Amino acid sequence: MDAVIAPRHEDCRDVERRAEPLPANAPLPMPVQSLLQSPRAAAVRSPAAWRRVLIMVATAVLSAAGIYEMYQVLQVGGITVLEGVVLVLFAALFAWVALSFVSALAGFTVLCCGWRDDVGISTDGSLPSVSSRIAMLLPTYNEDAPVVFARLQATRQSVDETGRGAQFDWFVLSDSTDPSVWIDEERCYAELAATHDRLYYRHRPHNTARKSGNIADWVERFGGAYDFMVILDADSVMTGDVLVRVAAAMETNSDVGLIQTLPVVVQARTLFARVQQFAGSIYGPMIAAGTAWWHGSESNYWGHNAIIRVSAFAGSAGLPTLAGRKPFGGEILSHDFVEAALMRRAGWRIHLAPTLRGSYEECPPSLLDFAARDRRWCQGNLQHGKLLTARGLHWVSRLHFLTGIGAYLTAPMWLAFLIAGILISLQAQFVRPEYFPKDFSLFPIWPAQDPVRAAWVFAGTMGLLILPKLLALFLVLIRSDTRRRFGGGLRTFGGVLLETMISALTAPVMMVFQSTAVIEILLGRDAGWQVQHRGDGAIPLREVVRRYALPTALGTTMAIGAWLVSWPLLLWMTPVIVGLLLAIPVALLTTRASRSRPLLMMTPEQIDPPAILAQVHALADRLCPANQTTDPLSALRGDRRLRELHLAALAFHPPRRRGRIDPHLATARVLIDDAESYSEAAGWLGPREIRAVLGDRETLQRLLQLSGEHAQLAVGSEPSG
């Protein structure tokens, strides 16, 4: 069993007794699901069938028109091998753009008509009553503990203000491997648990299956006591209003297994993060409304800020281990898509609620941090290729897998398309053409394209990319209240222009990063599990130059290649080349943090900040003492209550199995036995030995009882004794 801590209403000093009354064990079986056999499930009638026909027909017609025009561009004089490659790549990329455009157009239309969702969630009016038991689950991995707990506590206070707080229990499920983070989490927990009940903290000594395993462990141990669970990320904040409304919707719709809210990016401090924040705020609702409208009861799950029916999840979403070696085999990384697909396969409806406000998240502060997270997502999404043939999946669930895979494969396809285009031009410029083939022909073969039609194809493609932005802008401008929340019409229009320009500069760089990620995965390189970097995004100049050297070199090569052919080709490729050549200065500019109020790209949450976000800052400051020690051993040695809390939690660890030796713990025991003082022993222990000691009650007590100078006391601590 893992270390689990739970508060009682007694005095917070009674740590040993307080740790005993855990939430009553309510085991809930979560069997691993088979991908080879389809379970018997009740039929789900979706009103979205005709909507999907409309979307697919419109996408097919638009794609056919674009592909036909591109064929007409290339077929002048016959299609060569390189031109055939360009046509195939264009067909795939244009169909991708067409589907995105049609879906966004659907979102624009339904929002103009007042559509909200298919589960009847009211976004205003009085709050409904809730009678179900709801668990708020916050999985965390080596995050900034005071900020993580502050976000959770702000969410809790918002729920309590609705008068429905008694229905909610709160769990922090830690997979942290950093000893300092582990002890800091316990310190923050103790601070909040002293005055708040129904708050629980559990640390897993082994983070098996990462986040999905963390959630599954909770379901199997405590899930039977709860009707619903809300999954949060370490950067999630949700208002009580949105939580009560989605919980009531789950009660009303007994066949709904999951409702995904639309998280809005907040707290952006760098220019890069502000671009993502503004884009998500202004374009996100329209795009989400479009996908929710035609996905219907086969919508997707994004892994956080969603409410899930616990019994449905336990009975249908147990993840199998994929056959083969990493990166394609092993544990399923992008588990959210798969869990939603398995729940839908079992007959549960999956919905997206795109119009609910009050669901928030944060964004990586720089493109490098975004790309690091994207690398893990890329591997997880490509892994879904093994799941496309799973038995019994709904075709829309398979489409989710395909679009997730396509989100990353389109990057190397775009790069290949650009390179093939340059090669065609170089071939026409420098390679002597074979005007007369070896076989008999009355007419020569002229290598040529139609430049006028090519310009129209380019303009049409750009139109499909830009028009959704203009439609979203139109939705803001036509509503006076929405327009004011974005700072006015002129500032909103200027924000769209600035966002479009910066996105155009960073898109080619992201293309290179994603292409590199795909190649690495195909070569068998695993992404691992890195800590998500949050904060101000500051990156040393040397690191920026090193990481952006490849995009810059590629841009230089493309520019030289285009210049060797002709100035028109160079001008044609300017949007891509400029972004690559300016990769380093743009990176330095967009990672610079600013506390000042921006003139453009303002969002409603910046102009009129929700109270819950201000509470996060205040709570984080309260939970982070100025002279707090970062040494976990010193923290335990200098604070009796924290030490007793930690030791009480370790009482729930399973006993060591005979014959199984932890080499780091064994090394630590030898070093501790050989040391003449606490300071000497602590100085000899490395990070892995410290973590092993923190997880073993007997060894930790032996270390802390050694004589030696005490660690500096933390604020509010008591002398050891």
Curated annotation (Swiss-Prot):
Its EC number is 2.4.1.-. It is found in: Cell inner membrane. Keywords: Cell inner membrane, Cell membrane, Glycosyltransferase, Membrane, Transferase, Transmembrane, Transmembrane helix. Coiled coil: none annotated. GO terms for biological process: glucan biosynthetic process. Pfam families: Glyco_trans_2_3 (PF13632). Pathway: Glycan metabolism; osmoregulated periplasmic glucan (OPG) biosynthesis. GO terms for molecular function: hexosyltransferase activity. It is a multi-pass membrane protein. It comes from the Bacteria. One of its GO terms (cellular component) is plasma membrane. It is an enzyme of class 2 (transferase). Gene3D superfamilies: Spore Coat Polysaccharide Biosynthesis Protein SpsA, Chain A. Its main location: membrane. The chain crosses the membrane at residues 53-75, 85-107, 404-426, 456-478, 490-512, 567-589. HAMAP family: MdoH_OpgH (MF_01072). Belongs to the glycosyltransferase 2 family. OpgH subfamily. Involved in the biosynthesis of osmoregulated periplasmic glucans (OPGs). NCBIfam families: PRK05454.1-3, PRK05454.2-1, PRK05454.2-5. This is Glucans biosynthesis glucosyltransferase H. It comes from Rhodopseudomonas palustris (strain ATCC BAA-98 / CGA009).
